[in-house]
Amino acid sequence: EMGFTTVVEPAVLPINSFSVHLELENIPLIDKAGLAVMGNDTFLLDCLNKKKDQDYINNYIAWTLINSKCLGIKVINAGGSESFKRGSREFSLDDTVPSYGVTSRKILNTISKANEQLKIPHPLHVHCNNLGLPGNVKTALDTIDAAEGRKMHLAHVQFYGYDDEGKKGFSSGAVKLTESINKNKNITVDVGQVMFKPTVTISSDILRQFEA
């Protein structure tokens, strides 16, 4: 009824990819695909902690995509899961992942390089850190800078456009965000689907899911 010809499951946990493809198979007529979630997996964080080179990590990411049968990579709160487990409610791009000694920026930068070097057709699909928090527009701007000119897609940007000005410490950062997006031609975005009726949230953003 909505006219979709293609749908993409944007958060496939590689370990569950077989089940995802079985469920997608039950959807008739339209084209289907999935994006493999990376950026909080222990193996990748351990590789970065041990300073494995880019080729080593590229091989791991290629192996993950081949075996999950996914179209591309999705990064959700890069490194933020480990921080959340320890009680944190915010995790910015230059914060360090507990126990691993690497920043969220380093994780994002490394996966972005892999996406380009492996010539994955879909740009790196990113769910920025600090979704829904006042002042998170700074995190979104830092994320765009971290791409360093490489192609990157920011998902549901309406939730990253919050500044922290005004009496209540909450304001629109939409102008700052749109100026940066327009200036950086490597960046694409989607606004994010808004449903105006009761919804059920199922998200790999464990902080937001926890608070929902």
PLM features: what roles do these ranges have?
Residues E1, A36-N58, S99:
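Active-site mouth loops of central-metabolism enzymes
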Residues S19-L22, C47, K138-T143:
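A short acidic, amphipathic alpha-helical/loop segment
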Residues Y56-A114, N130-A212:
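Active-site neighborhoods of metal-dependent hydrolases
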